[in-house]
Amino acid sequence: MGPTASGKTALALELAEKHNCEIISVDSALIYRGMDIGSAKPSVDELARGPHRLIDIRDPRESYSAADFRADAIAEIEQIVSMGKTPVLVGGTMMYFKALLEGLSPLPSADEAIRAEIQAEADEKGWEALHDQLRDIDPVSAERIHPNDPQRLSRALEVYRISGKSMTELTQTKSAPLPYDVVQFAIAPRERKVLHDLIAQRFAIMLKQGFLEEVTELKARGDLHLDLPSMRCVGYRQCWQYLDGEFDYDTMVEKAVAATRQLAKRQLTWLRSWPELNWLESGAEGNLVTLMRQCR
């Protein structure tokens, strides 16, 4: 695990080449076909050195949830283990790691009809009245969700109307945790400025590699838009907006780099509270030796 631009892929490739391992990607951007440059997808040469599972498995117009990832990752892990190899999970989508390790609550999928029914009630009675409903059926969620947060309030009521159980009840029940021994590592530069510089350098390289042309091709399809999860990936949104004429080139670069730095900050926030985590410094000599020693 680690923030974007921290050197996860390079270390994973070194591990795969020198030991009996196979790589599974844990990245919500790498799953999409046609999104290669802006997602920092491993190059053809890198994939030849160490093939990655769970990349290029969805079209950008399709959704992919943490539950989807968990099911796919467990299937890949089982196959790798059956071959007598060790799976190495590499990426920066912390929600995927958490879902894989801890399991997920069995919340029902969205129901557009019930959601529309709730919205109609809110239009008639107001969200305060619906918050009172939630307090009656799920006081714990009502305490946590403000009446002025219609999205979360609607979802809590929707869950109850679909399942007959409160969100609090359902979130107390999770699927079984991962049935394997796991050794967890995070890699990051020691200094925040180093990471910020790496992010800016990598975005400049992406632009030279044709990132804007990649986004131009995605826009030209005609079936993609900025509300899709794929197009909300950092860099893609800013390039799309630049191509739409919303701001100039320098502003696009500034916004994309800033968004990527914010992503890295969120990733590090997750990692600092992550239990049983072994830390490695980006670019440090002996990282592979340290990693293998901890795995014994």
Swiss-Prot record:
Keyword Oxidoreductase: no
Binding sites annotated in the UniProt record for substrate: 4-9
Pfam families: IPPT
Region (Interaction with substrate tRNA): 27-30, 151-155, 232-237
Gene Ontology biological process terms in this record: tRNA modification
Disulfide bond positions: none
GO molecular function, one term: ATP binding
Annotated InterPro entries: Dimethylallyltransferase (IPR039657), IPT (IPR018022), P-loop_NTPase (IPR027417)
Reactions listed under catalytic activity: adenosine(37) in tRNA + dimethylallyl diphosphate = N(6)-dimethylallyladenosine(37) in tRNA + diphosphate
Entry's EC annotation: 2.5.1.75
Swiss-Prot/TrEMBL keywords: ATP-binding, Magnesium, Nucleotide-binding, Transferase, tRNA processing
Annotated positions for site Interaction with substrate tRNA: 93, 115
Essential cofactor(s): Mg(2+)
Binding-site residues for ATP, renumbered to this chain: 2-9
Entry function: Catalyzes the transfer of a dimethylallyl group onto the adenine at position 37 in tRNAs that read codons beginning with uridine, leading to the formation of N6-(dimethylallyl)adenosine (i(6)A).
NCBIfam families, per the entry: miaA
Stated family: Belongs to the IPP transferase family.
Assembly information from the UniProt record: Monomer.
Record protein name field: tRNA dimethylallyltransferase
Taxonomic lineage from the root: Bacteria, Pseudomonadati, Pseudomonadota, Gammaproteobacteria, Alteromonadales
